[in-house]
Amino acid sequence: MSVQQRFRFSGLRITRGALIVAGLELGLSLVWLLADLATRAQLSQWLEATPANVFEHGRVWTLATGVFLERDFIALILHITVLWMFVPTLERFWGTNRFYRFVAITSLVGTLAGCTFGLLIGALNVPISGLNPFIYASIVAFGIVYARQPVQFFGVLPLTGRQLMYGFLAFLALFVVATKAWENGVAFGAAMLAAAIMTSKRWSPGLAWKRWRIARARARLKVMSGGKGHVPPARDEHKWLN
């Protein structure tokens, strides 16, 4: 990142990657929310991830485009708030490239799991859209990485990162049960599980791969005989006496 770019983002709490993700969802969602019913139907048909769109019509690209289409304005505000307050901390810790991988993997896993479950129960037209899977996955990641970090929730409620994670999980469970949004619940759960695997030191695939390579390298190492090199024989002092 150039000096000019660093100066540009230094005055903002949000980081570049989080800002781009927020801008994509905000732009596409506002287009949908401000459009008429006919335009909404067209946008949903070609951009929104549903079991019917993905599995019946073969519009697999909606697994990616649907991530940035949020129908609920309140949920959209929540997404922007989380992207502004908590997600930049993760991006600074990971770096932008790893942050993008986290967004892609958790969003894809969550959306695909939700659509698959919707197909199994016959809810073919239930949308699995928006950044919800990634948002809740980022809360889980924050609770794991910054488990003991003090957090002022909205500047009022003092919590630790782990307590914040448990609070969101409890709220999410109540929401899914109260609304019976089982498809979205599966999507959220799959994304959060992916986040836990990616951020946990015990279950992280990247760390497991590194540990396997280190163990393999150690198995191939041979113990070389140590000690001194060639030692010249001791001088016969009596022989050289004058």
Predicted features along the sequence, with ranges:
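C-terminal transmembrane module of polytopic alpha-helical membrane proteins
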Residues: 1-16, 115, 171-242
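N-terminal TM1-TM2 helical hairpin plus the immediately adjacent luminal interfacial "cap"
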Residues: 11-128, 179-183, 187
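Hydrophobic core segments of transmembrane alpha-helices in multi-pass, intramembrane catalytic enzymes
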Residues: 79, 132-140, 187-191
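Hydrophobic transmembrane alpha-helices
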Residues: 87, 140-144, 191, 195, ...
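A cytosolic-side transmembrane-helix exit/cap motif
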Residues: 122-126, 149-156, 203-216
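Membrane-interface micro-motifs in multi-pass membrane enzymes
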Residues: 124-147, 159-161
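Membrane-helix boundary/juxtamembrane motif in polytopic membrane proteins
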Residues: 146-168
